[in-house]
Amino acid sequence: MLPVLTMLLVTFVLKDICGRMGMTDYIVEKTEPLLFPAIFPAMVFALGAVLAFTTGSDWGMSSIITPIVFPLGSVIGANPVLIMAAVISGGTFGSHACFYSDATLLAAQSAGIDSMEHALSQLPYNVIACVLAVVGFMLTGAVM
């Protein structure tokens, strides 16, 4: 329980620091002309997936990009439900595709196999889910 509380505390401190620096406003101002609401959820999914894969942390990634992508999505007119779905889906994909994430290590240990073997056996399913998620976010972003 202590690691979760520590992460929450660090998240609030990071949010306060970013707010005082005006980081969110700066990012929104610089990227708004380049983004379209129809493809924004797919972009958020891809960003979340890459960050969660490289860091191995689903919740850490979510706490970093959520304060940035929600104001940005609001400014460009993207659907907030799709944005949250993209953040959660990207984090889940990245966490399960990562070779050293907690989800991979726990699943491999509970099955009694090597973590790399488990990760490689999951990779084709993760890639299929990733492609379907990107297509789904593109379609729903265009419709909603």
Q: Predicted regions span which residues?
A:
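Juxtamembrane and boundary regions of transmembrane helices in multi-pass small-molecule transporters
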Residues: 89-144
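Transmembrane helix boundary and interhelical junction motifs in multipass membrane proteins
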Residues: 56-67, 99-103
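Core transmembrane alpha-helical segments of multi-pass membrane transporters/permeases
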Residues: 1-23, 38-50, 54
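Helix-coil boundary and interhelical linker segments in multi-pass alpha-helical membrane proteins
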Residues: 22, 26, 32, 70-82, ...
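Lipid-exposed faces of alpha-helical membrane segments in multi-pass integral membrane proteins
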Residues: 43, 47-50, 69, 128, ...
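Alpha-helical transmembrane segments of multi-pass membrane proteins
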Residues: 38-51, 77-100
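Alpha-helical membrane-interface segments at transmembrane helix boundaries
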Residues: 2, 28-36, 116-120
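Residue-level signal for the membrane-embedded core of alpha-helical transmembrane segments
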Residues: 5-9, 60-63, 84, 98
